[in-house]
């Protein structure tokens, strides 16, 4: 049996919750799951931008008519809304099998001493606190059936800190530490905890970081070939479609011409 067919069988009928699903890696992951499963999955797609989610759902309905999709406008930084969101999912989407904690952001490139307090709070609320809150809300579902996959999106910034990125780096180090601790807490279960740490990926990430400045965002990827969102999505789907006795616990994924945050060949 081919690897693709095995993956499709392992993913068939499963329900996956993806945060930050309206664009970038989240959107690509939704589509990659349906490609890998021949459309035989249920997707819960959560993000702030409902109109983008509805556009994605239309695309899915056309390309994968057998797939079931639930879209939800959700600001993951509003902690009080997380648990009710999970509890009030439609009945056919309640039995979540895979959680992809994808939502994340960076803001600015200020040095310590110049960073706005609200930016510090926003980055940690999104990248760390929300990820923990969603994991805590979904984990009882996994514990009840002794199975499930938790995928946390880390970053090379969570392994190799760099100047002018202190808050983002700190938040991603926190994600790595939380993921490692959680994996150890769940060692006596069949729940898999997976960290995917990308390097340079061309998405809306830099546009958000530089507050809509397109020129600054484009310069991040200038004269090099970054990863694309579907490259990371492919790895997420691969990791969650392995045999139950296997966990791709911690993976760093770079474009070919990158070796660290500031070792990127441009030419």
From Swiss-Prot:
The modification Phosphoserine is found at residue 260. Stable up to 40 degrees Celsius. Optimum pH is about 8.5 for the oxidation of L-serine. Stable from pH 7.5 to 10.5. Disulfide bonds: none annotated. InterPro entries: NAD(P)-bd_dom_sf, Sc_DH/Rdtase_CS, SDR_fam. Its main location: cytoplasm. SUPFAM superfamilies: NAD(P)-binding Rossmann-fold domains. It comes from the Eukaryota. It is an enzyme of class 1 (oxidoreductase). Keywords: Cytoplasm, NADP, Nucleus, Oxidoreductase, Phosphoprotein. Gene3D superfamilies: NAD(P)-binding Rossmann-like Domain (3.40.50.720). NADP(+) binds at residues 18, 75, 102, 168, 172, 201. It is found in: Cytoplasm; Nucleus. It catalyses: L-allo-threonine + NADP(+) = aminoacetone + CO2 + NADPH; L-allo-threonine + NADP(+) = (2S)-2-amino-3-oxobutanoate + NADPH + H(+). The active site is at 168 (proton acceptor), 168 (proton donor), 172 (lowers pka of active site tyr). Belongs to the short-chain dehydrogenases/reductases (SDR) family. NADP-dependent dehydrogenase with broad substrate specificity acting on 3-hydroxy acids. Catalyzes the NADP-dependent oxidation of L-allo-threonine to L-2-amino-3-keto-butyrate, which is spontaneously decarboxylated into aminoacetone. Also acts on D-threonine, L-serine, D-serine, D-3-hydroxyisobutyrate, L-3-hydroxyisobutyrate, D-glycerate and L-glycerate. Present with 3210 molecules/cell in log phase SD medium. Homotetramer. This is NADP-dependent 3-hydroxy acid dehydrogenase. The lineage of its organism: Eukaryota, Fungi, Dikarya, Ascomycota, Saccharomycotina.
